[in-house]
Amino acid sequence: MKKKILSLIVFLIPFLSCKQHVHSEVVIYNNDFESSDLTNITGGIIGQFNGSNVMGQFSNGDFVLSLNNLPAHDLITVSFDLYIHDNWRGELLPDGPAIWEMLIDGGPYINTTFSNLDCKEGNICPPQSYPDNYPNNNHNPRSGAYRTDLPGVCSMKTSPNGTTMYKITKTFKHAGNSISFECLDKLDQKDYPDPKCEKSWSVDNISIKAISL
């Protein structure tokens, strides 16, 4: 019996240790926007935040980055910095949900909400969906944030934590010759005289890699 078990273990070891290895990884796009380069981007605008160029600020807006003639690949990794500026309130009504989306080739990969509301420990606070997709009311404001100590840009410009920074990284199967990367919001701001001042968003340091297995 012991010999049979040992033989089975020896037989299984190669299969248990098998995993996909990265054959090659090619950066097909990288942009920190310091040169104000918007090549291949539709709807892009250059702004300044915290002493640096960013793409934004957007409010009820979007941009689409389109790349063609990609090298052969099996996976794509997209990474970027997302700045949520000013008075985002997550899923708090009446002007919620404050939805933000990321789409790849027209399909949603992120559909979530963000909140910059202050939430003291022990309090029940209006939630945001991130780092999960909407609807999800299990996360306090600024959950999953990389930085929470950045100033606002307009309606919360006097607040030292009026902007929240998120580092977003997504890897997904992809083998096509081209790719479109889109970010947008679905903010309800009809009751505000200056919607962009009330809440906006921007991105920076976009990097896209094509990975071959």
Predicted segments — roles?
Residues 45-59:
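Short carbohydrate-recognition loop motifs
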Residues 137-213:
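Terminal, low-complexity interaction segments
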Residues 84-95, 119-121, 189-193:
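Extended, low-complexity, turn-rich repeat/linker tracts enriched in Gly/Pro/Ser/Thr and Asp/Glu
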Residues 58-79, 96-98, 162-170, 203:
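Short beta-strands within extracellular/lumenal beta-sheet-rich domains
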Residues 91-100, 197-202:
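Short coil-to-beta strand junction motifs in C2/discoidin
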Residues 1-24:
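Bacterial Sec-dependent N-terminal signal peptides
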Residues 107-149:
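Extracellular/luminal beta-rich ligand-recognition
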Residues 18-45, 107-117, 121-123:
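Extracellular carbohydrate-recognition regions
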